[in-house]
Every structure is written in structure tokens, then in C-alpha cells.
Amino acid sequence: MGPDMTIFSSKRRDVLKLMAGTALLPLMVAAKPAMAQDVALRAIVISDLHSAYERIGQLLAAVETRIAADKAPHIILLNGDLFEIGNAVAARSASEIEWTFLAALAKLAPTVVNIGNHEPDIDNDLSNFVTRAQALGITVLSNIIDKRSGKPYAAASAQVSVGGRKVVVAGLATNAINTYPKATREMLDIPQPFEWAKANLPGIVKPDATNIVLSHAGVVADRDILPLLPDGTLLVGGHDHLNFVHEQGATRYVHTGSWCTSMTVATIAAPGKAAAIETVTIDRSAPASPALKTLIEQTLEKHLTAEEKAIVGKSAKAMTVDEAGRHVAQLIAAKTGADVGFVGHTSFGAGLPEGDIRRYDFNASLRFDGKLMVAEVDGEALAQILKRCNQDGDIPLAARTGDYLYAMPEKPEVKERYKLVCNDWSATNQKSYFGRSDLAFTEVPDVKLKQTVLGGLS
């Protein structure tokens, strides 16, 4: 996590904003009384898209199809990280595809975006993102303060009328400052998520409204925030690239995947009622939305270099992100003679396609390069570490750590001492990943992560 930041209370601003919105509410409710009372609200929830051009057209098509086929009122919720600076085409094209995607969403239904740590990836000044998104008619939320002005980049909450229903949406960010682009960090003052939530959410949520909280703070912070919420709240998580639903009374806590691989549809019958949750998988081979199909093709053709189009490996079958993560952990263990290999979950974006793998596809799968680091532990220490790894299954909320390590093999042969290998980010942040601070890592000379993995794919 990042260092503790100054806590800024936006309660007064939010209350004034909510009061201003309430003044129009009787007219809005009167316009559609039957719909407001008798028809469920549907929230389409997406998060952590990361410029995933191989599926963003299919994701938009899925949203379009869902809304066109269903007369229920909809709200679209994007919980941060639309952009990815690691996508060279996104950087070269100034994210034209993502902005076209946002414009299309705004035409389909009321759309709310909570700012994540990758919103300043392409343009490092967050205020430009806020201005441009608002110009599309999108409601932008954030509890991040612009240090230059001392003012928030956007309101931390908003009241939205959806088919005559009153919906209150709040948004908060991760304060892990090192996950934001380096060029933007000095502009950002980000409160500690739980402290901000404790000070502000009680004044934001309303007993007569559908309450939704968009948190890009991650599982660890969200677990502390959950007890603060009134029963029946929809808490949307992000940042950790997870996909699960946790039920607590009538409150639902959902993570909706990443890299445009899935979306969540939450059906809410009335304020305070438990949302019915449906996860929709996005098929890479499905038709893309006409609003994006040609643009994606032309943008890739224009901006991909010969080097990025070059075939750098082959895969016997398509791999999900979890399969790719385990495969990489196995490869680095084999390369270094380690007993167990470890690599961070969010080091990965997409999985890997079947057959030929272009460098562009490879970079989308393994986002970051780095050194390989080794350490030795005894059997008891390894057993404790392995309990924290491979959290892509059905893991209780209390056991989740947010980001986590893929570890392979999962059951190494029994011995007294074990050699571990991991990527350098995981070693540097060993307390978060390994759950301890006493591992003495040393660098493996002349070996890099991506180089090792490419050797295993050739």
C-alpha cells in the first residue's frame, strides 16, 4: 500500500450536491411512476478494462445487446482502469478506441465512472480525463484531491435518476501511490480508503435510495468498509483483477473481472433489497460492436510496428490469465532450478491465444518485465506462503489478500529447505505478497522475466 495521505472530508460538498439533485426528484419520479415502482433496476458493472482491444468491441456488443433486449431501466458503472500505458497502440493513438467506447456507453444509459489508478496512464493530468468524460455526459466520481488546487478532481458521490429511481453512487480510489503513473503522483493527494469511508459514506448513502459504492481500493480496504454500509448496498470492487460475489445480509460485494473478459449485471428490485448478480463472460471470438469494429482494426493496422506483429512464440492451446500465470511460475522455477516459482497475479492482463503469439499479444498477457529474485525458506515457511497463493478459486473473503501470487508447483516434494524464485516486484513488496518481511532475496544475474518466458514459448 502507499503511504498514509491527508484525509479530505468531502461530506459538505456531497451533501450540497445531493440536496441540489433532490430538488428535481419529485418531477423525475412523477414522470414515470409505474416504472419506478414496478420495474427492477439493472446495473451493468465493468472494471479494469486496461485497453484490452482484443475484447473491448465484444464487451460493448454485450452491453448493447443486453440493454436493447430488456426494457428495465439501466445504469452503467465503470469502476476504474479503462486505460493501459503498457498497450503501445493505446499510447500512440491517444486511446481513441477507449474514448469511442465511453461515448457509446453514455448513449446507451446513464454512465458513471470511478477513477482508478490507470486513468492518468495516457494523459497524466487527471483533470483532462474528468473534463472530457463529463463532456460526453458521463458522471465522474473520485475522492482524489488535486494537490495543485487543493480541490477534488471530481465529486465523490452523485445522485442519478434511472427510470425514476433514485440511485446514490459513491466512488473512492486506492491510495497505493506507486501504482499510479510516476509523472502524476506529485499531483495526487489520496485519503486512506477506510478512514475516508468512515468519515464520508454515512453522509452520502440514503435510506430511500438504491445505494452503490464503487471502490477501486482493493479487497483488503473493502473488507473493512463493508460493515460501514447499510444493508442492501451494492459494493463494487476493483483494482485486484478478481471475479467473485460475496453476500453479507442483503449487501452484495462484487468483483467483475478484468481485461474485458466479463461483466456483471446486478438486478435491484427496490432500495435496500439484495441485488441478484449475474456474471456474463465475454467471448473473444464473438462479433464486435459496429461502433468499434472498424476503428479497432484500423487503429491496430496504423499503430502496430513490425516488431510488435512479429511471432515470438506458440501456445498449444488458448490460456486464461490464471493458466498463463501458473505456466509462467513453472517456467521461471525450471529456468532457475527453484523448487517453487511465484509471480504476481496483476502482472498479467490477458491470457494467451492458441497458436502463434505476436509480441503485442505477449506484452498484453505479461504486462511487466523485471529481474528474477531467489530466496531460501524452510518447509514451515513455505507452507504458510502457499496458503496465500493461487486465489483464483472459491476463496472466503476473510482469506483474500487482494493481489496474490501464482505458485507452481502447488505441492512440491517434501524436503527441509526450499529455493523460491519470483519477479522483482513481488520480492520488493514481499509483505503484501508473501505475508512476511524476513525473506532474504538475491538477484539472479543476467536473467529477466520476459526473456525466460519467451524461451519457454518458443
PLM regions: where:
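Catalytic centers of hydrolytic enzymes
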Residues: V39-A40, I46, S51, S258-K335, ...
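A short hydrophobic/aromatic micro-motif that marks alpha-helical segments and, especially, helix-coil
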Residues: P26, V63, E96, G393-D394
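Short, motif-level signal for alpha-helix interfacial/capping segments enriched in acidic residues
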Residues: L25-M28, A217-V219, R223, D356-I357
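N-terminal secretory signal peptides and thylakoid transit peptides that target proteins
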Residues: P3-P26
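Short, well-ordered coil loops that connect the C-terminus of an alpha-helix to the N-terminus
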Residues: G21, A72, D231-G232, G337-A338, ...
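Acidic, metal/ion-coordinating pockets
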Residues: L16, A36-R284, E323-R326, Q330-L331
